[in-house]
Curated annotation (Swiss-Prot):
Signal peptide: none annotated. UMP binds at residues 63, 83, 144-151. Disulfide bonds: none annotated. Keywords: ATP-binding, Cytoplasm, Kinase, Nucleotide-binding, Pyrimidine biosynthesis, Transferase. GO terms for biological process: 'de novo' CTP biosynthetic process; UDP biosynthetic process. The keyword Acetylation does not apply. This is Uridylate kinase. Its EC number is 2.7.4.22.
Amino acid sequence: MSASPDDESTSSLDHQRVLLKLSGQALLGDREFGIDEAVLRTYANEVKTAVEAGAEVAVVIGGGNIFRGVEHAMEGMTRAHADYMGMLATMINGMALQDAFEQVDLVTRLQSSIKMEEIAEPFIRRRAIRHLEKGRVVIFGAGTGNPYFTTDTAAALRGLEIDADVILKGTRVDGIFTADPEEDASAERFKQIHGQEVIDRDLRVMDMTALTLCQESKMPIVVFNMGTSNNLRRLLEGETVGTHVHWDEAKASTERVPA
């Protein structure tokens, strides 16, 4: 199924098929614009360890390091036009990720929600699932293919379409906090939190459309630091990493740990 899988390695994973959401902003690294090659290498190595552990990995990438449609719409650009430009930015990032992944010997497929036949396959749900079953990393670009929808919503949608076990939101921080830990020394990290509390407290894990999609299908979400070595594999193997957002009424609503 995957690059190095055997029955023992795959059975040890808490999450077998995952949708990894990466922000375009995170690709900036120390730059003010564009793509930091060091960040690409880090992400490629993290995904490789996950695939080697037996996981099926699909990725949705944002485009905020290149173009943010919402911001330009606020400055006067037509919103739909700006959003389509943002979709193109996600494809640039998707191609960069594809190259980085292939440089560490991962087999990839880049799929686009809008037609770009020379550089990407069209998004076809059954084809994407088949790629995952064969151990290929599938990168989804161009968001949902529609304006007015964020790449977080694209991640929720694609995660549901490919029957992912969980949506993993890889960020530059260690999870969801009660306050900004860099500004508030008393800030605590949520170890786990019910999705309704995320909505009620407006914790901005994802936009409301994305959260609603996850809520309706009880799709769990984990917010974690993608830049910490082996975090992705540790998470897949069941270690407590980041913040787990769940929809299970039987679980404790929240659990916090010091930042």
